[in-house]
Amino acid sequence: MIDAWYNKSFWLYILAPFTFVFSALAKARRNSYIKNPKKVWDSPKPIIVVGNISMGGTGKTPLVKFIANELTKRGFKPGLVSRGYGGKYSGTLEVTPETTYKQTGDEAQILAKLNVPFFIDKNRSRAARKLQEKHDVDVIISDDGLQHYAMGRDIEIAVIDGARRLGNGLAFPAGPLREPKSRLSEVDFIVNNGGPTEGDEILMTLSPAKFIHLNSGKEYSVDKWPMHNQVHAIAGVGNPNRFFDLLLRLGFEFDKNPFPDHHKYNKRDLYYLDHLPILMTEKDAAKCKHFKNSKIWYLTIE
C-alpha cells in the first residue's frame, strides 16, 4: 500500500469515499480540542513535538536524537516521551538500555541509547507527567505525537521525506496523509529529510556513521568496513529504498530484502546458505539480537 501511495497509483481513487470519512473524523477530533481547551493538558515544562502528517517513514527518530543531543550539549536537561509502537507494556513504562524490544517496540530501543529520561505510553500526556514527576527535566521532546492533541505543545516540528514528499496528496486510506497538507502551514518548522527543499523547509541530511557487529558490538567507521562488499541487505522500515540507496552510494553489492515497517523477524527471514554478511538498519537490529546470528551487522546514521 505504501508503494502505491508514493507511486501515485490510479486505482487508489476507488478508496476516495473512505478517505472523506477519515478526513472528516480527523478534522472533527482536532476541532473538539480547539473548541474545548480544557481537554488539553498543558505541561509546566515546554514540549517539542517532532512528528509528521504522512505515513511511511520520514526520519523523525534521527531528528529526535539530534535535538536531544544538541539540547544536552547546550546545558539543558531533556526528557523523551513516545508511544512505544509495537511494544507489549501496559500503562506507563520508563525505558532504559536494559528494557527489552518486546516491551518497547523497535524505535524506542534506538532512543533508549541517548542516556536521557525516557517514558513510553499510548497516552503521551500521561508519559510526560510521569517523566516530570520522576526526573528533573527542563524540556520534553515527544517522538511523534503531532496528532496527539490531548497534549499541549510549545513547538511543533513536522518532518517530510524530501524525495517522496506527500505522495499522492490524499488522506488515508487512498493516500499516506494523516492530516491535510494545509496542516504544515500551522507548524513552527518543516524539516525536509534529504531534499530538495521548498519554501521555508529546513534541510536535514543524514550521514552514515558506523558499522556495528550485532553479536560482539565491534564498531567500524564507514570507511573501515572489515568485510567484502557483497552483502544481504535487509530493511524493515517505512522507506526501505532510502537504506538501499545509501548502501549503493557506499559501494555495496547486495540483494534487496524489504520488509514492512515494524516487521517482527523470524529465523527464516535471516537464513542464507552462503556466508555473506547481513547488513540492516539500526531499527531492524533492535529486533534481531536474540537470534545470535553472527553474520548480522547494522549501520548507524546521524
PLM regions and their residue ranges:
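Conserved beta-strand elements of the Class I
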Residues: 79-81, 158, 230-234
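C-terminal accessory "lid"/substrate-recognition subdomains
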Residues: 1-8, 165-279
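Short, flexible loop segments at boundaries between secondary-structure elements
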Residues: 260-264, 295-302
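Walker A (P-loop) phosphate-binding motif
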Residues: 30-97
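Residues in the short beta-alpha loop(s) of Rossmann-like NAD(P)-binding domains
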Residues: 84-86, 237, 302
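Phosphate/Mg2+-binding loops and adjacent switch elements
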Residues: 85-199, 210
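A transmembrane-helix-recognition feature enriched in membrane-embedded lipid enzymes
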Residues: 1-46
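Residue-level signal for inorganic ion chemistry
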Residues: 21, 61, 111, 143, ...
